[in-house]
Amino acid sequence: LAFPRSIAPERLALAALLGVTAGAAVLTSLAKANSQEIGVYSGRHYNTDKALYKQFSQKTGIKVKLLEAKDDALIERIKREGANSPADVLVLADAARLDKAADAGLFRPSRSASLNRDVPANLRESKGLWFGLTRRVRVVVVNPKAVNPSSIRSYADLAKPAFKGQLCLRNRKSVYNQSLVADQMILRGDKAASAWVKGMTANVTQPYFSSDTPLIRAVANGQCGVGLVNSYYVARMLAGGSGASDQQLANRVKVRFPDPAHVNITGAGVVKTAKNPEAALRLIEFLASPSGGRGYAEANNEYPLRGFGNNAALKRLGTFKADGVSAQQMGAKNKAAVALMQAGGWR
């Protein structure tokens, strides 16, 4: 067999060798992608989250190793673990906790065109340290037998003398209330926010609650006329997520969205010591996307980053106009908010 002069045997051998080498490189790259694993530390605890992580793994070949615990405990754990932490992604509820983790140097900045597109600017950290994934609203629950729901149009109304002996509040340790106060300080100024807090504490009728769910029960049972809670607690009860008895109680109360409404977030960032930051960012992009984010929000009866979603229980609550306050500014104001609450008698 004779070869043309232009394609000598040694050249064919070299081409074949290069082809094998290139093919091996591609296979090695694919194998590496398929063997990737990221550690996710999450303050959330819902089975539907695990289903979303599985969906992400099937789509990308990146495995997710999940650790769930309380938010503050996760922050302290990563601090202790230092450079040896297996965490690549940290998921936390509330802007104040995200800011706390950022201040502790736990996040690394990330740049992502899709996150800039999918996450509104006021719901992400300006340097890309963390990004909002879901929204929740601090709403007013009303017992219509005790209080006319239409008498409440804003958070400021709760400080009016007309509500003396009617108001129930969660205690000062609640990060949700701390962020609400920070929000009002940004919107209305420290002086007005201080007067508002003092007016509300003068109206409190029951000992301060440690959680939102028992507060909703108290309003439904007539122990309070009004109370402040996160929207998803009411939606969860309406959907029967905490039992038939709570579902009946939730149907007794009316929900008022103050105009404008304080919006907080669940968010996530890439951990500074992440072993696989690129894959970690891909997960956050997936969770913030319209498809992934919808499931992440509905798991806890929260709102997606844009719009109001299709959650039946949330639809029953109605719609709201967000106040547009920056979650980053709100988180940074946390210590000042706690001090203002303490000075105003919020126990």
Predicted segments — roles?
Residues 43, 47-50, 69-73, 85-223, ...:
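Extracytoplasmic ligand-binding site segments that recognize negatively charged/polar headgroups
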Residues 136, 165-173, 197-201, 206-209, 247-272, 286-310:
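Periplasmic-binding protein-like
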